């Protein structure tokens, strides 16, 4: 939801932020 969430996902290398 927040920009922090997208950064956390980037660390794992997932594409969850793609849904945002």
UniProtKB/Swiss-Prot annotation:
UniProt keyword Secreted present: no
Keyword Kinase in annotation: yes
This protein's pathway: Carbohydrate degradation; glycolysis; pyruvate from D-glyceraldehyde 3-phosphate: step 2/5
Region annotated Disordered, chain positions: 1-20
Keywords: ATP-binding, Cytoplasm, Glycolysis, Kinase, Nucleotide-binding, Stress response, Transferase
Catalyzed chemical reaction(s): (2R)-3-phosphoglycerate + ATP = (2R)-3-phospho-glyceroyl phosphate + ADP
Induction summary: By heat shock.
Entry GO CC: cytoplasm
GO terms of biological process kind: glycolytic process
EC number annotated for this UniProt entry: 2.7.2.3
Enzyme class, broadest EC rank: transferase
Assembly with partners or alone: Monomer.
The protein's name in its UniProt record: Phosphoglycerate kinase
Organism: Bacillus cereus
